[in-house]
């Protein structure tokens, strides 16, 4: 089983180095450069583990962990802190908040791998993965219900068409298309068209033909 990890680190060089190391170990690794970006990614993908720095702009690591714990769909994702905040009081705060590991920089990547493998051996990642999948399916079954018209417009949005182009194809007004796009954003809880497209592809909201084209190379126009 290939586990899906998110690395939250605002040091671009360090994040790339860690990503390459973990990919070599067989993991799928996504990168977020701050806590806010991490939250947006967490809502889109079912991560098995999050490795996060603490000192970051917008949303710091402690705040990120607190927000994850408050969300039923994300609360079981284990978090490992990887940070320069190495004081005992900082480590205690992290563990009290529910982190599964705390590594101080500079660190040995083999120690990080050991912590991850320990979580795998204890089935912590498997439990998080199953919980994420169940929650995701439940959300799709009970919350994301699209009308035929919404599905038609969503397919065209994923194809990269503008509202004007969609209105021409469907023989309706631009304002009416805008209304449906706004409704789709609301139903999926996405902030813009790009995130809507990614969410739709990842959660199979499209028909098979559109999904195959999208996976070949998604293009969107804001």
From Swiss-Prot:
Q: Which residues bind DNA?
A: 163-182
Q: Name one Pfam family in it.
A: Response_reg
Q: Where are the transmembrane segments?
A: none
The answer on whether this UniProt entry bears the keyword Transcription reads: yes
Which residue intervals define the domain Response regulatory in the entry? Answer: 4-120
Record carries keyword Phosphoprotein: yes
Residue stretches making up the HTH luxR-type domain? 139-204
* 4-aspartylphosphate found at: 53
**Location, primary (coarse class):** plastid
Q: Which domain of life is it from?
A: Eukaryota
Cellular compartments annotated: Plastid, Chloroplast
User: Which InterPro entries does UniProt cross-reference here?
Assistant: CheY-like_superfamily, Sig_transdc_resp-reg_C-effctor, Sig_transdc_resp-reg_receiver, Tscrpt_reg_LuxR_C, WH-like_DNA-bd_sf
Q: Might you report a single GO cellular component term?
A: chloroplast
Task: Give GO terms: molecular function aspect only.
Answer: DNA binding; phosphorelay sensor kinase activity
GO biological process per UniProt = regulation of DNA-templated transcription
CDD domains, from UniProt? LuxR_C_like, REC_Ycf29
Q: Write out the entry's keywords from A to Z.
A: Chloroplast, DNA-binding, Phosphoprotein, Plastid, Transcription, Transcription regulation, Two-component regulatory system
Name of the protein this chain belongs to: Probable transcriptional regulator ycf29
């Amino acid at each position: 089983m290939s586990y899906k990890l998110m690395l939250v680190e605002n040091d671009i060089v360090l994040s790339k180095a860690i990503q390459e190391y973990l990919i070599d170990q067989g993991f799928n690794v996504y990168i977020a450069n701050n806590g806010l970006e991490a939250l947006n990614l967490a809502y889109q993908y079912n991560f098995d583990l999050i490795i996060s720095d603490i000192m970051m702009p917008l949303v710091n690591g402690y705040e990120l962990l607190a927000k994850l714990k408050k969300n039923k769909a994300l609360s079981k994702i284990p978090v490992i802190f990887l940070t320069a905040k190495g004081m005992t009081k900082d480590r205690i705060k992290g563990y009290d908040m529910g982190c599964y590991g705390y590594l101080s920089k500079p660190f040995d990547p083999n120690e990080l791998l050991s912590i991850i493998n320990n979580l795998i051996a204890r089935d912590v990642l498997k439990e998080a993965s199953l919980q994420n999948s169940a929650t995701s399916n439940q959300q799709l079954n009970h919350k994301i219900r699209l009308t035929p018209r919404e599905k038609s417009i969503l397919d065209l949005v994923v194809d990269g068409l503008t509202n004007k182009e969609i209105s021409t194809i469907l023989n309706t007004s631009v304002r009416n298309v805008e209304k449906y796009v706004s409704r789709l954003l609301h139903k999926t809880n996405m902030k813009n068209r790009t995130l809507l497209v990614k969410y739709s592809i990842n959660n199979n909201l499209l028909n098979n033909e559109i999904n195959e084209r999208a996976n070949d190379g998604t293009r969107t126009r804001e």
